[in-house]
């Protein structure tokens, strides 16, 4: 019997392999290896893109987020109870898109743009990619037009401009959403379209917000995007991007839009959940390493774009108009800790923050804006002229009052100047209080600020400041309607308006009707 030589066998095998004619072909169909917690691992998808839609049997879709050497990790968008190991998975060659357009105004949709308000299907909408690159520096324009929130404390001290990103930050149940909703209500007649993105909120809370927007007539101007607390982490992670794409539709066509993200803390938690399930390495507070990029790529899309950008985007259909998308992201802190990971990230990305304080809220100062810590980095250039002129001393008065009030608790005998500063500060603090769902016009705000700035409140009791302000505004809107209309339209401050306001307030104070 002839003995086989191992080296000969290996040579024969090598020769056979070399002569084998196999054309390498990329496969765009794979097999589901595992399904758990909304995460699917797929083997055999050779040419899948990051963020690509993957189709499963039964019309279920997923999104590829982990591209590994031997498998692909994808999140399922929606229910995944029909999926099982061994099922096929196909590449679609498309990234996720959502409906955009004016047909969405007045509607409530989910994170994928499907209507959930029972008003029937959407009209003829076009679709656009959820993930888009923000406009470059060359295409941007500086912020120089205001977004009136209707809050005295914000518009006077922390003004917001069109194309700005202004963070609203504070503990839970402190009025963050109330402030954002009032800002949306105030845009009813301003020509600014609004998008409200609810992430991880209770459905009952969102239903109340939608009802309030409908009652005030602001819903017709607003798109509501909802990824409630009962929905998957994938949809909560995607909702802000979907809302941003809907807002960009207006910006890119030379319109102005305002978007509220309520809130990005819950989006970060949803993204952390997805990342940990995908077995990505955790970092600080168990968040993944790219949680900064999660928010920066979203908030950089809020911008003011130039006439050239709009003209190029619309192929010359719209000329001579700038577009803007203003963002009001909301972040929830734990016990006022603004130095936590996500709050510090978003503070560094945005153009300023409105800090709401629990102690002020509990002492009855609502909105509970802490003027000392709050700042608007670019809004000053966009502030209405009359508000800018009259609000100069307001922030100083409040800062001095807070400092002196703490000092005055220990000192028994105060000098005249200190006592006057304290009294003025008390009245300004009282004047900054405002009821929910009652945004003010520019003229009403200017009138209140003028009364405080020119010392007309000094002889009014602190407890009666609120009723004095209401009666004063009612008096001016009745007897000086022409002056108020002029302020609302032009927003200028000159000697004529100064004299008109002064004479009107003196006449009102003589009546003693508050």
From Swiss-Prot:
Compartments it resides in: Cell inner membrane
Binding site for ATP: 170-177
Record text on subunit structure and interactions: F-type ATPases have 2 components, CF(1) - the catalytic core - and CF(0) - the membrane proton channel. CF(1) has five subunits: alpha(3), beta(3), gamma(1), delta(1), epsilon(1). CF(0) has three main subunits: a(1), b(2) and c(9-12). The alpha and beta chains form an alternating ring which encloses part of the gamma chain. CF(1) is attached to CF(0) by a central stalk formed by the gamma and epsilon chains, while a peripheral stalk is formed by the delta and b chains.
Homology family: Belongs to the ATPase alpha/beta chains family.
Protein name in the entry: ATP synthase subunit alpha
Keywords: ATP synthesis, ATP-binding, Cell inner membrane, Cell membrane, CF(1), Hydrogen ion transport, Ion transport, Membrane, Nucleotide-binding, Translocase, Transport
Enzyme Commission code: 7.1.2.2
InterPro entries linked: ATP_synth_asu-like_sf, ATP_synth_asu_C, ATP_synth_asu_C_sf, ATP_synth_F1_a_nt-bd_dom, ATP_synth_F1_asu, ATPase_a/bsu_AS, ATPase_F1/V1/A1_a/bsu_N, ATPase_F1/V1/A1_a/bsu_N_sf
